[in-house]
């Protein structure tokens, strides 16, 4: 899909915010490509991010906006996880069908399956989603999925 000028302006605003955090050199580190896209409301898989120019480590490559834009457009067309996909994945760990899994199982799912997050990334996600365990150490995974899919700025 072709982006309108308003959409491109919105992309540029978010890109410039990442550039501001990244040293104000007119470019964003390619390692942050997926993060920029997620802030813009798409949820690309890491393999797809790498395929359009994302990198595995900070400092390998910088992306000016002119290179970011076609990468973003390419990622718009990629398969993305849906709410139903994530709910179905968590249901497999919900033995009693009550909508809860243990905090330990949540960590296991996030470190061992799919995109395999680091412990630091999981700590950050749990902190950002303000995830609360009940007295038995369980979390309501529907709330978790909704908060993660809403992104870091859900009111935007």
Curated annotation (Swiss-Prot):
Gene3D superfamilies linked to this entry: EF-hand
This protein's UniProt keywords: Motor protein, Muscle protein, Myosin, Repeat
Protein name: Myosin, essential light chain, adductor muscle
Domain of life of the organism encoding this protein: Eukaryota
Species the sequence originates in: Mizuhopecten yessoensis (Japanese scallop)
Example of a GO MF term: calcium ion binding
GO cellular component: muscle myosin complex
Pfam families (alphabetical): EF-hand_7
Known function: In molluscan muscle, calcium regulation is associated with myosin rather than with actin. Muscle myosin contains two types of light chains: the catalytic light chain, essential for ATPase activity, and the regulatory light chain, a calcium-binding protein responsible for Ca(2+) dependent binding and Ca(2+) dependent Mg-ATPase activity.
Domain EF-hand: 6-43, 81-116
């Amino acid at each position: 899909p072709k982006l309108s000028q308003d959409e491109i302006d919105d992309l540029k605003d978010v890109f410039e915010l990442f550039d501001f955090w990244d040293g104000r050199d007119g470019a964003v580190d390619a390692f942050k490509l997926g993060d920029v896209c997620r802030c813009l409301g798409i949820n690309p898989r890491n393999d797809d991010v790498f395929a359009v120019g994302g990198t595995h480590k900070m400092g390998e490559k910088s992306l000016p906006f002119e290179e970011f834009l076609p990468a973003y457009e390419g990622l718009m067309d990629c398969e993305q996880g849906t709410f139903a996909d994530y709910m179905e994945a968590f249901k497999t760990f919900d033995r009693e069908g009550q909508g809860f899994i243990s905090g330990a199982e949540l960590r296991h799912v996030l470190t061992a399956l799919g995109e395999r997050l680091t412990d630091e990334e999981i700590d950050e996600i749990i902190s950002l989603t303000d995830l609360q365990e009940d007295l038995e150490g369980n979390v309501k995974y529907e709330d978790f999925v909704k908060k993660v899919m809403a992104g870091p700025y859900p009111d935007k």
